Amino acid sequence: MQPSSGRRFTFQTSVYEEACGRLVLTSFIAERRRPGTIIKTSLEREFYRMGSLPEFPLENPFENRNRFYVVDDESELRANDWIRLYLELSVAISDRTTTDHDLSGLRIVSVAIQTMEPPSESSLTAKNATVYIRYIDFCKARCGQNLDRIAVVRRNLQ
C-alpha cells in the first residue's frame, strides 16, 4: 500500500520449496506490477551457491554482543514482525506429520543477528544476515512437551 494515498498495489513474488523439509522463501521479483503485464526475470542466485547454512557458532550467539546484534526486548521484537514470520516458516516445515498447525504457542525469547558488519541496530535491516531465533514451543500437542529451541534462518536480499 502506498502510505500517502492509501492505494494498494499488486506485487509479483515467488515462493517455492527446494526439497521436502527444506523451505526456500525467495522473492525473485519485488517491484510494482502494472495490471496486464508479465514480468520475466532470471536473477542470479548467488546466495544458494554459497552452500547450506553455516555451522552453528561455538559460542552462544545470544550472549556474544561483539559478534551478534541481540534483540531480546519485547517491543523491538514486535516492531520487527519479520522475525515472527521467519520463525513460523521454520516451525511449519520442521514437522510435516503434525495435524496441529496452531503456531500461537511459540514465544520468541531472543534473536541474534550475524552480518558481515559490526553488530548494530542496522543489522535488523541487513540484506545479508544469519538470524538465530531462540524460542519456546508451548504446543504439547505438536511436540509432546514444552521445548526451548533455536531456529536458524539465512537471509539474502539482492
Swiss-Prot record:
UniProt similarity note: Belongs to the UPF0725 (EMB2204) family.
UniProt xrefs under InterPro entries: MS5
Annotated source species: Arabidopsis thaliana (Mouse-ear cress)
Name under which the protein is recorded: UPF0725 protein At3g57210
